Amino acid sequence: MKYVPEKGCYHGAFPPLYGFDPEDREGSTDQCAVALFEKLVGKQLSMILWYQNMEPGRNFSEMQTVREKYWGKNYQGKYRFFLYGWLPVITTQQMANGELDDFHKSYFAEVAAQKVRDMGPIWFRPANEMNGSWTPYYGDPTNYVKAWRRMYNIAEQLGVTAYNVFVWSPNSVSMPGTEANAMKNYYPGD
């Protein structure tokens, strides 16, 4: 299934409250400052990016709470998509060796159960910017590809991939800019 807009593009953002100057917050204490961002740009968002660490103890219901709060309709009268920036706190070798398998199984089982509510697909963005030296999972393309495929296979076995979207999202520039760390080396395949 493809999620291509009928016309134009999806207007999305990562709108954390800390991105606004204190004088522009209008008294808001909402960590996901969707209303402030929409007021700033003059239109409703089609997609919201929010982050969560990929680690035991974190679960889908935590993200689902954010999703439900901001599920409103966008400017085209359709419900907003949610892009989950999923950040591992371990190395790609640890992920490739299966250290997150139980976490993924539990998480994706929750995701599959939520499909019944039909809030639309979730866009998963796991281990993004893997070609940047600021992440704990950079610098090991071989294990990154193994880890991605391992995670995706678990999602596939639990029926999550047929309805949801998985987004591979490297940084625009590889750092360090070596051939061994080139963006193309991290691509897990179609």
Q: What name fits each language-model region?
A:
Residues 5-6, 45, 139, 161-163, ...:
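Alpha-helical structural elements
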Residues 1-47, 156-159:
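N-terminal module-boundary/linker segments of secreted carbohydrate-active enzymes
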Residues 43-55, 84, 88, 182-190:
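Aromatic- and acid-rich polysaccharide-binding/catalytic face
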Residues 22-41, 59-69, 103-109, 178-188:
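Short, acidic/polar
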Residues 51-173:
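Substrate-binding cleft of extracellular glycoside hydrolase catalytic domains
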Residues 164, 168-190:
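Flexible, glycine-rich surface segments
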